[in-house]
């Protein structure tokens, strides 16, 4: 959330607050200054529009609150991006996704602004821990030419950062195989064993200052 202050000699000072910017988004603020012969400050609380009428791209933004409470599995960051409209996993265990029918090798994966897409397969090389993610943007269609060399989607992931106070958390995620449904009957198994999926994952995060107001750290395991 940002604020903008405009001031000029002979005019009233005007401040607009509550301007919220999502990852990859832009906001426009029209500030009008009136003539003034005395000191005066006008504060206007405003928010950027939910629908951006200046672009045709199909974008989905997930903030930290959504990432923390999303009703999805939390074993890889693909569990988050696959929740975006038009995006689906190529397989149940793959490190690649499809967007509106595009091929899996036509996407781009960005982590804190760095391209970590495998050049040959189009997969994501590192898998960011879901609890270390601050914000996610999925450009399903109409990604701007800034990215280039792609016909699919852009998955932009921003990780959490340290602050002036120490904070941390630890989590354990578990899905028992008894929670996985069986799609066949015993007569349809052809005497082959039926293996259900079972997942276990533990995470630990810690962040804080090395030097307050200057240098911070954040780690996730």
Annotate each language-model stretch with its function:
Residues 31, 83-86, 116, 130-175, ...:
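A beta-strand signature from Gram-negative outer-membrane beta-barrel systems
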Residues 43-70, 104-107, 114-116, 187:
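N-terminal periplasmic "start-of-domain" segments of outer-membrane beta-barrel proteins
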Residues 180-187:
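Outer-membrane beta-barrel translocator domains and adjoining extracellular loop/strand segments
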């Amino acid at each position: 959330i940002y604020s903008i202050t405009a001031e000029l000699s002979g005019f009233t000072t005007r401040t607009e607050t509550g301007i919220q910017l999502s990852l990859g988004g832009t906001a426009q603020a029209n500030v009008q200054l009136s003539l003034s012969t005395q000191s005066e400050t006008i504060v206007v609380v405003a928010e950027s529009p939910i629908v951006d009428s200046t672009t045709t791209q199909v974008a989905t933004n997930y903030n930290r609150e959504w990432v923390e409470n999303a009703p999805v599995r939390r074993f890889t960051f693909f569990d988050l991006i696959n929740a975006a409209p038009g995006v689906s996993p190529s397989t149940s265990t793959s490190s690649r996704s499809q967007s509106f029918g595009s091929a899996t090798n036509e996407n781009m994966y960005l982590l804190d602004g760095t391209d970590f897409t495998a050049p040959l397969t189009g997969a994501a090389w590192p898998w960011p821990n879901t609890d270390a993610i601050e914000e996610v943007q999925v450009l399903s269609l109409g990604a701007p030419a800034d990215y280039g060399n792609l016909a699919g989607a852009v998955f932009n992931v921003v990780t959490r950062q340290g602050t002036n106070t120490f904070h941390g958390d630890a989590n354990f995620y578990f899905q028992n195989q008894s929670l996985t449904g069986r799609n066949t009957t015993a007569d349809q198994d052809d005497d082959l064993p039926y293996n259900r999926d079972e997942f276990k994952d533990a995470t630990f995060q810690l962040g804080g200052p090395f030097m307050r107001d200057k240098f911070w750290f954040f780690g996730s395991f």
